[in-house]
C-alpha cells in the first residue's frame, strides 16, 4: 500500500490464506501529512541600530494553528564568542548579558516536515555607556600658568569618528587607539578662561558627555607702578608714594 498524498483515515486489512480462508479484519489508523509548515512570525521588542542593541532584546513569536499535525518551534541561540549554545522548543532562549549572538529559528511538525524558511539574525548587545577620563598634568586650580590634559575614552564597541572634543585649548595629538581605549592630548597655553568637553557614542547608541569645570590660564607677570616720586630726584620733604 502506497499513499502519495495527505491522508488521515482508517485502513482495514484482512489476511486471506491460500485456501481462501479469511482472517479477522484489522483497523489501522494511518495519518500521512506531507505539507511543510510555515515559519512562525518572529518579533523583537526593539529596533536595532545596524544590528546593535543598547538594551537586551527580547524575541517572541506567533505561530498560528492550522489543519494537520501539531507544529512546534525550534530555536537556537549561539554565543559567538564562547560558542555556548542554548536551545528551546516552543520558546526562544533569552539573551542574559552583553555580547554577540546568533539566533536561528525554524518550525517542524510532528510528521517530521520542516519549514523551508529559516529565521536567522545576529545580535550585538551593548548596554554600557562609554567611559571618559581626563587626567591633568598639573593639579587642578582655578588659575594656572600652564595645563595639559590627557583624555581617555574606553568602550569595547567604539569608533574613532564617534568621539567629539570641544575645547578652548589645542589638541596636540589626534585620537589614537591604545590597547582597549582611545586617547588624545590637549594643551592650554593662551591666557583666558579655558573649557573642555568630551562626547563619545558607541555603536549601540550609548552616549556619554562630560563637561569639565572651567579654569583660567594666566601667563602674564605682575606689573608694579609707583606714583608720587620721580626716578633720580631728591626730596627735602616727605612724599606720598602709591
Predicted feature descriptions by range:
Residues 1-242:
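Low-complexity, disordered linker/stalk regions enriched in Pro/Thr/Ser/Gly
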Amino acid at each position: 500500500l502506497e499513499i502519495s498524498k495527505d491522508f488521515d483515515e482508517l485502513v482495514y486489512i484482512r489476511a486471506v490464506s491460500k485456501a481462501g480462508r479469511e482472517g479477522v479484519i484489522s483497523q489501522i489508523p494511518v495519518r500521512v501529512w506531507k505539507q511543510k509548515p510555515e515559519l512562525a512570525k518572529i518579533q523583537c521588542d526593539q529596533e536595532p541600530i545596524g544590528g546593535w542593541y543598547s538594551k537586551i532584546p527580547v524575541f517572541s513569536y506567533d505561530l498560528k494553528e492550522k489543519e494537520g499535525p501539531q507544529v512546534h518551534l525550534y530555536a537556537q541561540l549561539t554565543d559567538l564568542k564562547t560558542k555556548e549554545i542554548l536551545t528551546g522548543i516552543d520558546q526562544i532562549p533569552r539573551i542574559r548579558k552583553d555580547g554577540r549572538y546568533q539566533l536561528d529559528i525554524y518550525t517542524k511538525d510532528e510528521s517530521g516536515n520542516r519549514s523551508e524558511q529559516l529565521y536567522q539574525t545576529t545580535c550585538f548587545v551593548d548596554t554600557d555607556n562609554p567611559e571618559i577620563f581626563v587626567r591633568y598634568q598639573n593639579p587642578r586650580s582655578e588659575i594656572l600658568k600652564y595645563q595639559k590634559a590627557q583624555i581617555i575614552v574606553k568602550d569595547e564597541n567604539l569608533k574613532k569618528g564617534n568621539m567629539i572634543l570641544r575645547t578652548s585649548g589645542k589638541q596636540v595629538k589626534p585620537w589614537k587607539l591604545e590597547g582597549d581605549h582611545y586617547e588624545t592630548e590637549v594643551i592650554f597655553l593662551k591666557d583666558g578662561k579655558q573649557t573642555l568637553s568630551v562626547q563619545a557614542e558607541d555603536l549601540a547608541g550609548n552616549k556619554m558627555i562630560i563637561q569639565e569645570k572651567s579654569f583660567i590660564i594666566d601667563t602674564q607677570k605682575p606689573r608694579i607702578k609707583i606714583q608720587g616720586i620721580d626716578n633720580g630726584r631728591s626730596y627735602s620733604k616727605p612724599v606720598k608714594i602709591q
